[in-house]
Amino acid sequence: MFRCRWTPYLHADSCHGLQRLLGGEYNFNRTEASIWKRFWLPASWGKIDCSVKAGAEWNVVPFPLLILPEANLSYITQRETFSLINNMEFLNDRYASMSLSYDMNGKLFNRIPLIKNLKWREMFRIRALWGTLTDKNNPFKSSNPDLFRFPTRDGKFTSFVMDPKVPYIEGSIGIYNIFKLLHVEYVHRFTYRDNPGINKNGIRFMVLMVF
């Protein structure tokens, strides 16, 4: 049985833009919602943080106004962001994302005598993104002159339409409480590994103080 000590956090917002209002060139209408919940596991097996988000852009807009994944291009890890997605790699007008973070709170390391004295803690993460681009916003399927062609570099596209049946997935294994301050994790990309110019693996850091 999970022990749910924390009430879920719910958030929803709607963002609108009007053409010719304060210099706006396009109408856009975006709706997003998210929920976050923490689950405590029995027998001191740690906790799981779960976050789910979903959103839609309802209007016809050029690609800079489409929904871009929360890509983190730095070496500093940030919660609920994607460490190995390039900026503007996927362009969606409908999306859903999920982030799971499992903090074992030293359950494994405490069984290893030498490691136990260091008081390191282990953490596992999985992040996934589902997305699609409707035909009205797809410049390859629409003749609307207001839509921009996707960006390119050296003659190759750098932005792509996701397969709605194939989510983007990345996972990581991390150690925190190093010197009571440092968090280090290894990140691996599981899907869309053939996209040009991507990193399939990486090392990320974070300053994380645990009390």
Cite the ranges covered by each PLM segment.
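Exposed, low-structure sequence patches enriched in small/polar residues
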Residues: 1-211
